Design a protein with these regions (language model features):
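Short, surface-exposed loop or secondary-structure junction motifs
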Residues: 40, 44, 97-330
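Residue-level signal for well-ordered, solvent-exposed loop/turn and beta-edge residues enriched
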Residues: 33-34, 79, 351
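Short, conserved catalytic-motif segment at the N-terminal edge
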Residues: 2-59, 95-96, 228, 364-365, ...
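Short active-site loop at a secondary-structure junction
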Residues: 17-27, 46-110, 148-160, 238-241
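Short loop/turn microsegments at loop-to-beta-strand junctions
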Residues: 22-24, 35, 331, 339-342
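Structured C-terminal helix/loop/strand segments within mature extracytoplasmic catalytic/sensor domains
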Residues: 334-384
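Short, positively charged
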Residues: 1-14, 320-326, 379-384
Length: 384
């Protein structure tokens, strides 16, 4: 990189100084070289714990590409298929409920591209959280969720879909024995270790929880089911948003999908498929499942004409992005998490960037003043 990344570092430092975010980690790499690894502020405001390389961050929905990678590893092994009917693996997901034949048409590819017609969360999402339901109850509820439109027609971001993907992994990798979610957790964590990720936890123990950054501005403060922070939430291991990871390991994971990286755990074909545009339909109209949308959905924003996705990863595809910048290549892929986490990479430049914070996205700090897009612009401007 011929330019300096000092301006990108200064941008994040300024957000800390201004009180925009309590703590942050910024990492940038190119090829095998880590160009920036900086930590600022506090990981836990109440305990005055500083953010350090040992901090475990709630990466929220960046968990989804991990689940997608686990599914693709099963495809590599001949256990699962992208385009077979979902009901072939999950027979509970059968029959139509006044939905025409839509349910029978849903495939794992639809789930991985958020084009299945399933809503963001189940109808019973809050009720289950309030009664401290186990993760298995969430998965069971997903089997009965409505398919709101013909699969492939529109984009509707769906945690339900990735929960079903994880269930497919658990049933296939577990050989039909034992609890599928246990098999999913083992398989996904083994895959991460094979990719070089050493400190990632679905079910952090008491010692590990001492290192977790406390997420501010969740909108659920003080509730015993608060996202990211509550003892209950940390016991769920949600495959769509429940991982706690050190920042360097997030960088390792996203970098694993760049060309030239070696992996025996996940084939080059699988990794390429995940970061290649598989679908780019328009957003579903705001009238579709408005009460079951993701917490970062903004109903005041007009629907997008194209929403490009790979398999588990969002692909910029030349469209505007809140976090992948204004001048990055169309092939850039990434994901963000509601906890205030961002990871993206540019295959053409061999570049990867990770910003982890502990202020929730739904406070809208990343999109105010286009903060995270500006950060990506600063990073891209430093390229040769």
């Amino acid at each position: 990189m011929s330019g300096s990344l000092d301006s990108a570092v200064s941008l994040v430092a300024g957000w800390i100084d201004e009180g925009v975010i309590p703590g942050a980690a910024l990492l940038v790499s190119r090829g095998d070289d880590v160009l920036v690894e900086r930590y600022w502020g506090v990981a836990d405001m109440s305990r005055k714990v500083p953010a350090t390389p040992n901090t475990l961050w709630s990466i929220a929905s960046i968990t989804k590409p991990v689940t997608a990678a686990a599914f693709m590893a099963c495809v590599d092994r001949g256990l699962l298929s992208l385009d077979a009917p979902l009901s072939g693996v999950l027979p509970e997901f059968t029959g139509d409920r006044g939905e025409r034949p839509w349910r029978r048409d849903v495939t794992p590819r639809h789930l991985l591209t958020h084009t299945s017609g399933l809503a963001g969360f189940s109808r019973d999402n809050l009720a289950m959280r309030k009664r401290h339901a186990p993760v298995d109850d969430f998965i069971a509820s997903f089997m009965d969720e409505d398919v709101h439109f013909q699969p492939g027609r529109w984009h509707l971001y769906s945690s339900v879909g990735l929960g079903l993907i994880a269930e497919c992994v658990g049933r296939s990798a577990g050989g039909g024995k034992g609890r599928p979610m246990d098999a999913y957790w083992r398989f996904a964590l083994d895959l991460l270790r094979d990719l070089g990720v050493n400190d990632a936890f679905f079910l952090p123990d008491d010692d590990q929880q001492q290192h977790i950054a406390w997420v501010e501005s969740t909108g659920q403060e003080g509730l015993d089911w608060e996202i990211g922070n509550s003892k209950y939430f940390r016991s769920l291991g949600f495959p769509w948003g429940g991982l706690y990871v050190r920042a360097r390991d997030v960088l390792t994971f996203v970098s694993a999908f760049l060309p030239g990286k070696e992996s025996e755990a996940l084939s080059a074909a699988a990794r390429k498929a995940m970061i290649t545009q598989n679908a780019a339909p328009p957003d579903a109209p705001a009238s579709v499942a408005p009460t079951q949308r993701d917490v970062t959905w903004d109903p005041t924003r007009p629907p997008r004409a194209r929403v490009p996705w790979g398999l588990g990863w969002e692909v910029r595809g030349g469209e505007a992005s809140d976090y992948m910048g204004d001048q990055s290549h169309a092939t850039v892929f990434g994901h963000y998490g509601a906890s205030g986490s961002i990871a993206w990479a540019d295959p053409e430049e061999g570049l990867a960037a990770v910003l982890l914070t502990n202020r929730a996205w739904q406070s809208w700090w990343p999109v105010h003043e286009r903060r995270t897009a500006r950060l990506a612009n600063e990073i891209m401007a430093a390229l040769d």
